Amino acid sequence: MRSDSDRARFEREILPHLDAAYNLARWLLRSSDDAEDVTQEALLRAYKFIEGFHGDNAKAWLLRIVRNSCYTWIKSRPKTEAMSAGEEGEFDPAHERALAEAGHSLPAPDARLIAAADHQLVNAALERLPVAYREILVLREVEELNYKEIAAIVDVPIGTVMSRLSRARELLKQNFLHGDR
């Protein structure tokens, strides 16, 4: 059983990065449901090994656990099992009502459609990237991590992070400009 100090440390240092953990899992697994499962598993692992965390970057430590959990999950799946494209950009009436009730103005329907179409194009271009490039791009551009943090998570030298990021950006550009629309 964990001590109260371990629990408090976990809540203070690890839980604030829950969204980043889910986002990484979502991009690597291409499925919201699978990302939720893997994120929960990764959080359990992080909690179990919290006393082993002696670093100063809890986000990088957690994202490395999430990344490893994602790859373990992928390896455990049958090769023929397809990963879904996910639900990004879908209309969610409950979410729309909650935003309206909270006093947030909603964009016009045509603006929402254009934004959703743009979102789908970017997502489709990202989905076509090899996972090694996609993870680097997501960690840098979505999670806004620096090269050193990404290198620690992915367990490669900083130079490799830089070259993969450059290549990922170029491939994303090609996918976006020349990919299936």
PLM feature segments, named:
Residues 1-23, 33-36:
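A short, charge-rich alpha-helical start-of-domain segment used by transcription regulators
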Residues 136-140:
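A short pre-motif secondary-structure segment
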Residues 37-44, 48, 56-68:
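Structural recognition of an alpha-helix C-terminal capping motif at a helix-to-coil junction
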Residues 67-86, 101, 115:
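Arg/Lys-rich amphipathic alpha helix in sigma70-family domain 2
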Residues 13, 17, 21, 42, ...:
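Residue-level preference for hydrophobic side chains embedded in well-ordered alpha helices
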Residues 91-127:
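Acidic, proline/glycine-rich intrinsically disordered inter-domain spacer in sigma factors
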